[in-house]
Amino acid sequence: MNMLSNISQVEFPFEEISEVKRKLKEKEQKRIVLSQRDFDVLNFILEMKFASVDEVYRKFFKTIDSQGKEMGFHYAKKRLVQLAGSDFLKSTKAFSESKRLFFATRRALSALREIYPGHEFARPSGSIDSRTIVHDYLLLKLRLVLEEKGEVVHWLSDRTIKVQTGILSHLGEAYSPDAVITHRDGSKTALEFEIAVKAKSRYQEKIKRYVAWIREHRQDPSAFTRVHYVVMSPTTQRHLEHFSGIYSDLFKIELADGYLGEYGGVKC
């Protein structure tokens, strides 16, 4: 009997064949060609910690047909699932299991760094922090509202601020704003979003630090020149208005209802 005959008679266990097929399938799933929109989505999710299909659809996929019907939600959901299947994203259920949130992985960060060498990106969170999830999700909603109103043309998140140098002098990482936003006219504003009432001393200290920072950087055209507080509680609004006092021209303090009400209220 020749060697070919011997080989043809070799039997492979069914379990081994199944395992090979499974690995081949997984390898095939990881083969994905990233588009510019994919990179934008990954960076957006890195910046904001996480996002659901709703937010990704609204920012990147939403289109209106000739009858005025919104389209694109199915494609947004499908693409997020594909990105998760290729290990660029992970997901988890949140808010009583009613919503799936996607967050970026190290593979997403590596892909972004490869396309944009030298650019500082936020680090992957690795998970979703239950202590800040409500604040983070409402901040995500607030960002979309401000962008859709045309009030914001660029958003620099606190997560990105913390990996860049120079912005936190006099403020300190613990007092970093939630974002630095750029307006149509090129001016910049530090954005603070408050969902809970904090100690008066913290508001007083933060106002003091902001005033010092703005004064120190008044000759820097790239620096923010005002601070915009969006708050959930009238009590917080009163405290901030009190401590901003004579510096009120540097601060804009508003209740969140005027913004988040346009995004289906403040519910998650």
Protein language model regions, located:
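Amphipathic alpha-helical dimerization/coiled-coil segments
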Residues: 114-156
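Nuclease-adjacent, charged terminal/linker segments that flank catalytic cores
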Residues: 1-126
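Soluble or luminal CAZymes and related metallo-dependent hydrolases
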Residues: 75, 134-138, 202-205, 209
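Active-site metal-binding core of divalent-cation-utilizing nuclease and nuclease-like domains
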Residues: 92, 131, 144-189, 198-202
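Short, solvent-exposed loop/turn segments at secondary-structure junctions
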Residues: 48-51, 96, 109, 160-162, ...
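Charged, structured surface patches that assemble and position nucleic-acid processing machinery
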Residues: 246-268
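Catalytic cores of nucleic-acid endonucleases
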Residues: 195-246
